[in-house]
């Protein structure tokens, strides 16, 4: 944040939900910088673009490796940006830099070595005929609301553009700022109000009528030469040797002769946690000034965050609902810092949590005062203090105690991970329902943004890995963004879980409109390989007269009719 602008580095799933909860002003976001084009970095971009458009921002510029624009091409039928111009700066271009009234930024592309080269596909095949379906025409009542798209075929070679694999480091230097004129010092030195103040403020020494010389340095605070901060990511070991030997980054290290002005105050690391512990990476970090603050934001290789998802609201409402039924609304097993735990703010290597703040100008350094802290008793007391709540709660408990179960079946079990909220907010996520058909056999109905995170938040990492490894199918009724934009993150999270649990689970059965192919294949060829993680069954194949049910599925699934959109395929699910 600055007084003039806000700059966003990476934009993972759940970004707009956190922005809404913590009152982050998206109206000031016009520049977004990406350290690597992985889903963990770009998964929140489609959703946050819609939010930025809604608050009236006319333009945003994406800085990163080539191919970022493909994300919006692939999503153009369900991410409708009529009033937002999205620009892309190829940060791998050696002539590219960024500069505005606040700072100058240099881009440092870092390529993997040959061992990190992505495998070539067997053939050069078209991704898919571009999807020109207007998914919003029925509800908006006007097909012209969505610009017509020219039907094309998007061709991709088996190899990605080599530059699209680049990781980006950003060296950011704030512009110098003159010291502030201190009025009390002017009075102390006998400077009368008037034009002489302006001369001193401009850095000019003056002579008073009595012949006394007053130096500008006597009455101004010191000039700020412009602090440096660096944002980096080393995605995996195939980048490591090139990363630690990158000359422009080494020039910033104290051990290599960097001056006080060039030494970064802060180094922000999006590097995976395990890789930051590699001896080469640790040695590289040790080259910076001893006072540099290393802010660690990376995930583990299993997709885990260092600590917490940063939302107090989900814990607050879960503690309050827990009062109604402790089994249906169990306490969440996540480990945000609980009230009373000590802060750890002295280490130069800091495991960052949401709202960790470092002030560069004026240089106040680290501030942890805004970091979310769980206060369970406060949330309970908040509910109990409501007029009439205790009496209503007691009546509910008595009613439940006398209730007769309508079934003794243990399954199916449903967990509502999201509801019909088309835009995520602090207490509601977008559409997703997890169904446990029998013990440790799951399917998912819809997969809105942040669904993977909701599963981890509800079950905790260990149990979530088991659940995801035993997830056999996902059903997506239609291609509104709030019903499927979390699918890529879920596919990757499931694969991490399979590897973690050493499961022999095969590809996920994906039941969805066939048009989803354009989105998924474009992502597969332009960003990361994901096609091996799923098998697509088109919803059209479930209609009566074709394939009434999927006999190989964990449940009997058939289609029904719907009026939500012309392309919606509702589902009738019958447990075996």
Region locations from a protein language model:
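Residue-level recognition of the N-termini of beta-strands and the immediately preceding loop/turn
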Residues: 29-30, 58-61, 86, 265, ...
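Pre-active-site segment of Zn-dependent metallo-hydrolases
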Residues: 1-58, 68-83, 186-192, 196-197, ...
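Eukaryotic, compositionally biased intrinsically disordered regions
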Residues: 450, 455, 516-517, 535-546
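Structured loop/turn residues at beta-strand edges in well-structured enzyme cores
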Residues: 24-27, 262, 466-469, 506, ...
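Metal-dependent phosphodiesterase/nuclease catalytic metal-binding core
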Residues: 1, 96-415, 422, 432-437, ...
